[in-house]
Amino acid sequence: MATLEDSFLADLDELSDNEAELDENDGDVGKEEEDVDMDMADLETLNYDDLDNVSKLQKSQRYADIMHKVEEALGKDSDGAEKGTVLEDDPEYKLIVDCNQLSVDIENEIVIVHNFIKDKYKLKFQELESLVHHPIDYACVVKKIGNETDLALVDLADLLPSAIIMVVSVTALTTKGSALPEDVLQKVLEACDRALDLDSARKKVLEFVESKMGSIAPNLSAIVGSAVAAKLMGTAGGLSALAKMPACNVQVLGHKRKNLAGFSSATSQSRVGYLEQTEIYQSTPPGLQARAGRLVAAKSTLAARVDATRGDPLGISGKAFREEIRKKIEKWQEPPPARQPKPLPVPDSEPKKRRGGRRLRKMKERYQVTDMRKLANRMAFGTPEESSLGDGLGEGYGMLGQAGSNRLRVSSVPSKLKINAKVAKKLKERQYAGGATTSGLTSSLAFTPVQGIELCNPQQALGLGSGTQSTYFSESGTFSKLKKI
């Protein structure tokens, strides 16, 4: 009898046979599996305790070359972009594009270093990462605190707001962390220094891009300013990428979650990024800032497209867009027009009410008060009325069901509804005469003093014996004489 171990081994043999057949039939799949195995091997050999294995951007040749060019460009003044050249062929624009890509890489590298610091420092103060979200602020706070257990001895006033400092101090008293070993603490401090160096390099790159915005993107700079234009280009990945981006995405570029430390978020601005730092947005009343942000984003996208095609190197279009934005915001702030007094209607201009007619009579007949309702609404003097619940409770019935004078009160027909005598006579004749038909009360026997009972023609009274009947068989009639031809 086979054991459980033998059955497992048999299943593994079958799986190995199937894998061999698949490798023979499809060689590409085998290559992909080898690549995956290589990647997994690299991940296994990666040492997360070593900062150099995690963060490699600062030691790359591309980082060193771009930073060297940026420092040289900041040290000397430049006249701007060369006139008459295509934007993509301009060496200064190429450097700006490289700086934009490098700024994105620096942002990603800061996030990697931030995660490294959090993984190491959570043994000391795990709750700090939920209180301080920004990577640079977190690195500064960690470098300031170190292995200190009493935060009252640490001055964080120049790093965090007073409300956040109070929350951090209270949370540090209840944390379950312990002091870090000396080697781990040195790695954490080194990571903090690297994060700060990356942040200073990013600021230097943005400063260079900002200084060149007047020549590279004059229209965009005229709307949002050079600093915001540089940040937008750096986040989007260049002027061409920014020109292809829709306005709804430009509006949220640079938007970050704000740490309110338990306070209400009802008054915080949502879905606003770098455009919040523009002069137009800051000078707009709070109730109109959301609309102003959408308008600035739309016009900034148009200005970026003009700059990408080098359509207006002087920035006239950008100034026109800015003036249009200003006029629209002023128009929004204007009070609504005063309510005009309503003029009086012209005398006798209203249509007269219809007081008669067939439709109105039918409607009055349909909604007139019935006889039962009239009796229910009428009460006899000195006679109590009956009620639905008895003893005068409930709905009263009035004179319904009471013995009266045994005389039926019939309402007279209104004079307007009566027909005249002539019309009534004609209706009566139609009813009994029936036209040419003989009435059932008419008899063909007549009593005369000469012969007694004799037959008579009942149609003689109607004058039907006329025409040929009166002359053809008449005693006084003569024969017709025909004249021969």
Swiss-Prot record:
Annotated keywords: mRNA processing, mRNA splicing, Nucleus, Ribonucleoprotein, RNA-binding, Spliceosome, Stress response
CC per GO annotation: Cajal body; nucleus; spliceosomal complex; U4/U6 x U5 tri-snRNP complex
PROSITE patterns according to UniProt: NOP
Oligomer status and interactors: Component of the U4/U6-U5 tri-snRNP complex composed of the U4, U6 and U5 snRNAs and pre-mRNA-splicing factors. Interacts with STA1 and SOP1.
Location of the region described as Disordered in the Swiss-Prot/TrEMBL record: 1-36, 329-361
Effect of deleting the gene: Developmental defects, semi-dwarf phenotype and reduced growth.
Motif range (Nuclear localization signal): 352-365
Major place of residence: nucleus
Bias (Acidic residues) ranges: 11-36
Ranges of biased composition (kind: Pro residues): 334-348
Organism: Arabidopsis thaliana (Mouse-ear cress)
Compartment(s) where it occurs, according to its Swiss-Prot or TrEMBL record: Nucleus; Nucleus, Cajal body
Family statement drawn from the similarity comment of this UniProt entry: Belongs to the PRP31 family.
Family annotation (SMART domains): NOSIC
Nop domain mapped to chain residues: 216-334
One family name in Pfam for this protein: Prp31_C
Nucleus in keyword set: yes
Role noted for this protein: Involved in pre-mRNA splicing. Required for the assembly of the U4/U5/U6 tri-snRNP complex, one of the building blocks of the spliceosome. Functions in association with STA1 and ZOP1 in spliceosome dynamics and pre-mRNA splicing. Required for transcriptional regulation and pre-mRNA splicing of cold-responsive genes, such as LTI78/RD29A, KIN2/COR6.6 or COR15A, especially under cold stress. May play a role in stress response. Involved in transcriptional gene silencing of endogenous transposable elements, independently of the RNA-directed DNA methylation (RdDM) pathway.
Protein name: U4/U6 small nuclear ribonucleoprotein Prp31 homolog
GO BP annotations, alphabetical order: cellular response to cold; DNA methylation-dependent constitutive heterochromatin formation; response to cold; RNA splicing; seed germination; spliceosomal tri-snRNP complex assembly
Classification via InterPro entries: Nop_C (IPR042239), Nop_dom (IPR002687), Nop_dom_sf (IPR036070), NOSIC (IPR012976), Prp31 (IPR027105), Prp31_C (IPR019175)
GO molecular function, one term: RNA binding
